[in-house]
Design a protein with these regions (language model features):
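P-loop NTPase signaling cores
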Residues: 1-240
Length: 240
């Protein structure tokens, strides 16, 4: 398979018109930003702004399931998504449960209106449970062929009894490059200083943040071990 760099928006633009791209699996090391990416996609679609990722990205209703939290319920009663999601929605806000009209999710799923985001396909410790969860995901993809699915997994966890039987396009989250590391650090310190100053972003705050950022950037660029760690977003926040 060839290796080339692209943006997630390029794939979102193809979700409706290209059946081959309706099944995406996103690989990434722990802390590489897989869950953050899924949350970001969910937010962009919930705000009806996917065009910011790509001008041709179609609108969907996002459904983000954290499999590490949901898999016990799924395996206890492995029903179709159209039966699982109404109960899931009702439990999102227990103080004031949300109710969807009967058959609403079934209609949305069959009319290609939902984007199913499944985070952490590999995050089930028991091997048999992981296989059963994989089978359930496969069943949903088979049952709703028009509905796009995006899954995340660690590479090792995906091949160890979690690989899908359905054909999927596999993408990989790339490590941060040096310019992305610098931008991340600058934004990180600006956010910290702004919060520290009660939301103010005057020149003094910006200057303090810039000085702290520059010190860390210099330290990382002079230390190969730190530089390697900094390419992982989670480890970079720990260094900062």
């Amino acid at each position: 398979a060839g290796h080339y760099e692209t943006q997630i928006g390029d794939f979102l633009a193809l979700l409706k018109k290209e059946p081959d791209f309706r099944r995406l699996v996103i690989f990434g090391a722990p802390g590489s930003g897989k869950t953050t990416l899924m949350r970001y996609l969910s937010l962009m679609y919930a705000n009806q702004t996917p065009h910011e990722l790509h001008p041709k990205a179609p609108q969907f209703i996002p459904v983000l399931l954290y499999l590490r939290e949901e898999y016990p319920k799924i395996l206890k009663n492995p029903v179709l998504l159209e039966d699982f999601l109404p109960q899931w929605v009702a439990e999102l806000q227990k103080s004031k449960p949300l109710k969807t009209p009967p058959g609403w999710f079934a209609q949305q799923l069959r009319e290609q209106r939902c984007l199913i985001l499944l985070d952490g396909l590999d995050e089930v410790a028991d091997e048999r449970d992981r296989q059963r969860l994989r089978d359930w995901v496969d069943e949903q993809m088979y049952e709703y062929p028009e509905t796009p699915f995006i899954l995340t997994s660690r590479p090792a966890g995906y091949t160890e009894k979690a690989e899908l039987k359905q054909d999927a396009v596999v993408l990989e989250v790339e490590p941060l490059d040096s310019e992305q590391i610098r931008e991340f650090i600058r934004n990180w310190y600006l956010a910290l200083e702004t919060k520290k100053q009660g939301g103010q972003t005057d020149l003094g705050v910006q200057d303090d943040a810039a000085q702290q950022a520059q010190r860390l950037i210099a330290e990382i660029e002079q230390n190969p071990d730190l530089s390697e760690m900094a390419s992982n977003p989670l480890l970079l926040t720990m260094i900062a």
